[in-house]
UniProtKB/Swiss-Prot annotation:
One of its GO terms (cellular component) is nucleus. The keyword Transcription regulation applies. This is DNA-binding protein S1FA1. It comes from Arabidopsis thaliana. It is found in: Nucleus. Belongs to the S1FA transcription factor family. It comes from the Eukaryota. Keywords: DNA-binding, Nucleus, Repressor, Transcription, Transcription regulation. Transmembrane segments: none annotated. DNA-binding protein that specifically recognizes a negative element (S1F) within the RPS1 promoter. The keyword Cell wall biogenesis/degradation does not apply. InterPro entries: S1FA_DNA-bd. Residues 51-76 are annotated as: Disordered. Pfam families: S1FA.
Length: 76
């Protein structure tokens, strides 16, 4: 192998895309698409889905809250 031949190949490879840029595009592109799609779905869900139903409050907790407020609990 000649030194000139090696220098010619290096010059030809240098004209191509930077490998770091390729890795950045391959990893960053899908990641960016994923994040944007998640945001779009989140906004869509906030507008169109009904609000969550609240969990039923237990009678024990209801009694405790009424005692805190000073309201007499019926049956006692």
């Amino acid at each position: 192998m000649d030194g000139e031949d090696f220098a010619g190949k290096a010059a030809a490879e240098a004209k191509g895309l930077n490998p770091g840029l390729i890795v950045l595009l391959v990893v960053g592109g899908p990641l960016l698409v994923f994040l944007i799609a998640n945001y779009v779905l989140y906004v869509y869900a906030q507008k169109n889905l009904p609000p969550r139903k609240k969990k039923p409050v237990s009678k024990k907790k209801l009694k405790r809250e009424k005692l805190k407020q000073g309201v007499p609990v019926p049956g006692e």
